[in-house]
Structures are given as structure tokens and as C-alpha cells.
Design a protein with these regions (language model features):
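Extended amphipathic alpha-helical interaction segments
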Residues: 3-106
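A cross-kingdom marker for long, charged
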Residues: 93-148
Length: 148
């Protein structure tokens, strides 16, 4: 539906540029985020023993958590890159497609095939990202159960 109002793909390109900037800003802040969390724990209003235990648990799990965060940002980066490729293809071959009833209609089978494959890749990356999120939540819940 958005494409029906963005036939020259200017808005789509703008969304891609903004998404890349957001991903870059937040993915580059991953280390800082974990350091900030640790600093907050160090200054938490807890007994020294409780604080040591909390910090030990944080230090034990933060390495894996940071790896997962980096992997999630990598999925986001890949998804946006593939979407960028799609927008570029559609822009470069503007005369080979049109929008009808809020759907792209291709006048060229090879372009349709290429865009479909790229959309399948976006779907696949999204599913892999979601699976990583689910497994991370499951692992976190299991670790919380061990503490309780």
C-alpha cells in the first residue's frame, strides 16, 4: 500500500537510509550499553555480598548476551541491505513494474523472480532473527529458574 503512494521510491530510499543510521548507532553502542549496565549494578543499593553475586552473574552471562545482541544487529543489517538492493533494483528498472491495487505488478518475469528471491531472503533472515530472540529468552528464563 505504501508503494502506491511512493511510486518514485523516494520515501522508501529515505526509510532505508534512516534504518541504516539507526542500526549503526545502536549496534555501535552495544559495548557501551553493557558497560553502563555493569556500572549501574556496581552502584546498586545492595549488600556487598549481594552485589558481588549479581556482578558475578552479570559477568558470567554478559559475554553471551553481547554476542547475541551483536548477532541480532547483524540480522537487522542484512535485512536492511537486502531491502536496499530491492529498492535499487526497482528504481533502476522502474519501467518494468507498476502498482495496481496496492500490489507490484511486474512486466518482466526475471525482475519478478529476482525481487521474489530477495523478499524470500528477507523473510528467512527475519525468521532466523526471531529464532535467535526466542532461544535467548528461553535461555534467560532457564537461568532465572536456576537462581530461584
Amino acid at each position: 500500500q505504501r508503494l502506491a503512494h511512493d511510486k518514485d521510491l523516494v520515501e522508501s530510499r529515505s526509510i532505508i537510509v534512516k534504518a541504516k543510521a539507526i542500526i549503526s548507532r545502536y549496534s555501535n553502542a552495544t559495548d557501551e550499553h553493557f558497560a553502563k549496565m555493569r556500572a549501574e549494578l556496581e552502584h546498586a543499593d545492595l549488600s556487598e555480598k549481594a552485589k558481588r553475586d549479581v556482578l558475578r552473574g552479570f559477568d558470567k552471562s554478559s559475554g553471551q548476551s553481547k554476542i547475541i545482541a551483536i548477532q541480532l544487529w547483524a540480522y537487522e543489517t542484512q535485512i536492511v541491505e537486502v531491502m536496499d538492493q530491492i529498492i535499487t533494483e526497482l528504481t533502476n528498472k522502474r519501467k518494468q513494474w507498476y502498482v495496481r491495487d496496492d500490489r507490484i505488478v511486474f512486466g518482466n518475469a526475471s525482475l519478478h523472480q529476482l525481487i521474489s528471491k530477495k523478499m524470500e531472503r528477507v523473510q528467512q533472515l527475519g525468521e532466523q532473527e526471531e529464532e535467535l530472540r526466542r532461544s535467548a529468552v528461553k535461555r534467560a528464563n532457564e537461568n532465572l529458574d536456576k537462581v530461584n
